[in-house]
């Protein structure tokens, strides 16, 4: 079953992205490098 997740910037704490994942196949937390519009650089975003 797919669930909606929010990706939170690790440096400023803003919730910048909404995504979905399959909890059955990927139970671990998502971490990805994304663009943060507040800081205007690419930063690490984690599932929140």
Curated annotation (Swiss-Prot):
Stored SUPFAM superfamilies: Zn-binding ribosomal proteins
Family (UniProt): Belongs to the bacterial ribosomal protein bL33 family.
Stated name of the protein: Large ribosomal subunit protein bL33A
GO biological process: translation
Entry keyword Protease: no
Gene3D superfamilies reported for this sequence: Ribosomal protein L33 (2.20.28.120)
The organism's place on the tree of life at top rank: Bacteria
Keyword Ribosomal protein included in the entry's annotation: yes
Keywords: Ribonucleoprotein, Ribosomal protein
Any GO molecular function: structural constituent of ribosome
NCBIfam families in the cross-refs: PRK00504.1, PRK00595.1, rpmG_bact
Any one annotated GO CC term: ribonucleoprotein complex
PROSITE patterns for this protein: RIBOSOMAL_L33
InterPro entries referenced in this protein's UniProt entry, alphabetically: Ribosomal_bL33, Ribosomal_bL33_CS, Ribosomal_bL33_sf, Ribosomal_zn-bd
């Amino acid at each position: 079953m797919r669930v909606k997740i929010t990706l939170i910037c690790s440096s400023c704490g803003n919730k910048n992205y909404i995504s979905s994942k399959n909890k059955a196949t990927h139970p671990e937390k998502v971490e990805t490098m994304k663009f943060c519009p507040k800081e205007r650089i690419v930063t690490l975003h984690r599932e929140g």
